[in-house]
């Protein structure tokens, strides 16, 4: 129930009045991608275990942080999020982790959205990294506006350092 509202309003950007027809359009357009994802992600234990390990480190390093209770996977539009934090869950958009050579990313539309240097990280092994990046961003919101480039680089380096310690392997 909680994620459904987030999915419909924030990911699909559906207005309540247009929900049913737009939802049907999305469903029919993305059903083939969903079917492909079920074969690619038959076995998600490895990614789920790494996220759980990251949660254990989070609990150790940030004991007051409220960890997500659930891990949810979904298929969203190609230009949607790779991971989303809700009040009680972390949701992973599998459409951005189908493998770097997936036709979705190598197509003209895919390359316009995500050039090769970006889509090379659209592998299942990057799911835990994306999840932990999102959590680190929740703990330390971006404050780079108006800062010099070197300060922004240092800020990003600090985030990478924290993520490296949450996912040590």
Where are the regions that the model predicts?
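N-terminal mature-domain "stem" immediately C-terminal to a signal peptide or N-terminal signal-anchor/transmembrane
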Residues: 1-32
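Acidic/His-rich structured neighborhood in mature extracellular/periplasmic domains
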Residues: 23-169
